[in-house]
Amino acid sequence: MPAPYSDQRLEQLLQVTGFPPPTGFAARATAADPAVYEQASADPQAWWAGQARQRLTWDTPFTEVLDDTNPPFYRWFADGTLNASYNCLDRHVQAGHGDRVAFHWHGEEGEQRDLTYADLLAEVQRLANGLKARGVCKGDVVGIYLPMIPEVVVAMLACARIGAPHAVIFGGFAPSAVRERLEVSSARALITADGARRKGRTAPVKAAVDEAVEDLATLETIVVVRSAGSPCPMRPGRDVWYEDLLGGADGDCPAEPMEAEHPLFLLYSSGSTAKPKGIVHTTGGYLTGVASTMATVFDPDPERDVFWCTADVGWITGHSYVVYGPMANGCTSVMFEGAPDYPDKDIWWDIVERYRVSIFYTAPTAIRACMKWGTQYPAKHDLSSLRLLGTVGEPINPKAWLWYHAVIGGERCPIVDTWWQTETGAIMISALPGLTTTKPGSATRPLPGVSAALFDDAGREIDQGNGVLVLTQPWPSMLRTLYNDPERFVQTYFSRFGPRVYFVGDGARRDEDGYFWITGRIDDVINVSGHRLSSAEIESALVAHPLVAEAAVTAVSDELTGQSVVAYVTLRDGTPAEDVMKEALRQHVAGRIGKLARPKRIIWAEDVPKTRSGKIMRRLLRDIAEGRDPGDATTLRDASVLATLQQATAQDDQEPAGMPETGSKP
C-alpha cells in the first residue's frame, strides 16, 4: 500500500535535495555503468550504430551510419532496410513469444481483452492485405482516427507493414481539424470508428467525419471499426466495415523491407501559425530511438514487467511509448480506453492493481488532478507492483513530484521526468533510473548519445544559468522534414542558430550539477494538460465566428493543467458583450479544434497590443493576464491599449472562469 502521506511528510520530503536510485533497482538496471555517458559522447555515431544493431532486426544491414552532407536534412542508416511491423511482431513470434500478451486492453465500461503478439500479427496481416486490395500502396498516406481500442495498433502496424505512412489524428479533435490533416497529407484512406465512448456517453464519429470529408477528392476508402455501436451511413464503393475487409483478406502478408529513411508516419503538431505542422519520422532512425530509450529509461524486463503509458495514441507519446517502443522490446503493456475519473477517480489504481502494472508513465496534469482528488483513491488499492514511475508532456513541479513519489510510488520507486518533443521522436533528457540521483522538478541530464546545451540569444553556450535549450548534434529519431514543406522545416528549427543546431523552442536552466530544468515554451505554442495547441489556430477559430472582429490568445499558468488559454476578444459593433456569448465562443472553438482548445477565460477587449507592423504582442497579454506589469511598450502602435486591457482583466477576475479541459495525452 502507499506510504502514509501528510502535509508534514511533504514538508520533510521538500528538504531532500536528491533521491539516489534504490540499491536493488540499480543492481539489475539495464543502464548501470556510469561510463555509458562518456562512451556515447566520445563517439555518438558509434553509440547509435550499436543501439540500432542491438535493438532492431535489419533485412539489409547498414554500412553508413550518418549522412550529414546536407544539414539539416540528415540521413541515418540510409543504405539499410528493415520493417517496423516485423520488428514489433514477427520476430517476437518467431522467437517463441507469440503467446506473450502484448496488450491488456481495458474498456471504458470495464471490458477486458488480452491480445498476444500472435493475435496481433494475424490481424495486422489481414488488414495490410485488405488495404492493398483497396489500392493502398507504398508511400500512400493512411489517416487513422480511432479511440483507444486495439484496432488503432493494428492499423498503425498494418500500414508500416506495406510502407504506407500513417497519420494518426487525436480522437479529441473536431471533424474540421480531421479534414485539414487529411487534406494537407493527401491521405488515400482513413480508418475510423462508428463512434467513441467518453465518461458514459457515446459520440458519433463516422457521421461527423462524413460531413467533414464530403468533397475530399484524394480520399478513396474509409474503413469503419464497430466500436461504440453508433449507427452510421456507409457510402457504397468508398466505405467498408473493418470486419468485412479483414474477412475477405488473405492471412499471409510478408513484411516488406523498407529503406531506413522511408517515412514511417506523419504526425501533425501545433505550431505558432494556424497551419498544423506535418512532422515526418522515418523507419530506421525513429525505431532506433524509441527502442533504445524504452530499454534504457524504463528498464523493462519483458518476461515479468507490465508497462502502462497512459497517453493517447493520437499524440507522439502514444506512438513512441504505447506502440513502437514497448513492442520493439517485446513488452506487455496496458491500453485503457477511458478517462482517469470514470466510473470513479480510482480507476487508474484499480487497473494498476488488476494487471500488476510495474512501470507507470503519465503526465503532470494527471498527477495534479489525482492530488486534488485526494489520497483516499490510490489508498483503496495495492500498488506494490509498481517499481518505476515516469512523467511526460510538461515540467512537473516539486510538490507534484513528491506526491507522486510518496503516494503512488510508496517512496520506493525512482521517477524518470522525461523531456522530449513530437519532433525529437524519443526521449532526449531524462534520468537513467539505475544511475541518476533525481531532483524533484528536474529532467536531469541528456541521455547517452544526445547533445543538449543552453544558448543565449547570440548563440553563445551557457554553462550554468538560464537560456534557450538547443540540441547541437543530430540523433536518429529526429524529424526529417515537415510534410511537403521543407522551407518551413528549416525556418522553424534550423534558422535561429544555423543548420547544425536544432532550436527546441523551450527555455531551460542548468544547475551546478549540470541538471536541466525546463522552464517552458518561448514561442506561441500553448501547453494545456501536456497537449500542444497553436495560439494562431485558436485565434483563427475565434475570428471565424461571425460576431468576432478580432481575437488574441495567450497562455497563463494553471495549477491543474499547467497552462490554460486566455482569449482577448473584440466583438463586432452592436454585439452585446454578455456571458452567454463567452460560452458560445468556447463551444465554437471546441467545434472547430476540440474541447482542449476552449479558452478558460474570455475577456472583452476594444483592441489588443500590436507592433507598428501589426504583430500581436502575446508576451504583453500574458503579463496582463497574470497580473504583472507589462513593462516597456515603446514598440506598440498604441500603448494606451495596455491600461484598457488591465482594467478589463481586473474586472473579469471577479467573474468565474470556464472549466478547463483536462484530457489525457496522457
Predicted features, each with a name:
Residues 221, 526, 552-559, 563-570, ...:
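Conserved C-terminal "lid"/linker of ANL adenylate-forming enzymes
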Residues 287-306, 316-358, 372-376:
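Conserved AMP-binding/adenylation subdomain of ANL enzymes
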Residues 109-110, 189-260, 374:
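ANL superfamily adenylate-forming
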Residues 461-463, 470-536, 543-544, 561, ...:
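Conserved ATP-binding/catalytic segment of the ANL
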Residues 124-125, 247, 279-300:
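Conserved structural elements of the adenylate-forming
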Residues 99-101, 223-224, 235-268, 275, ...:
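Conserved pre-ATP/AMP-binding loop-to-beta segment of ANL
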Residues 243, 324, 328-331, 358-362, ...:
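Gly/Ser/Thr-rich phosphate-binding loop
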Residues 85-86, 99, 103-157, 174-179, ...:
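Conserved AMP-binding/adenylate-forming core of the ANL superfamily
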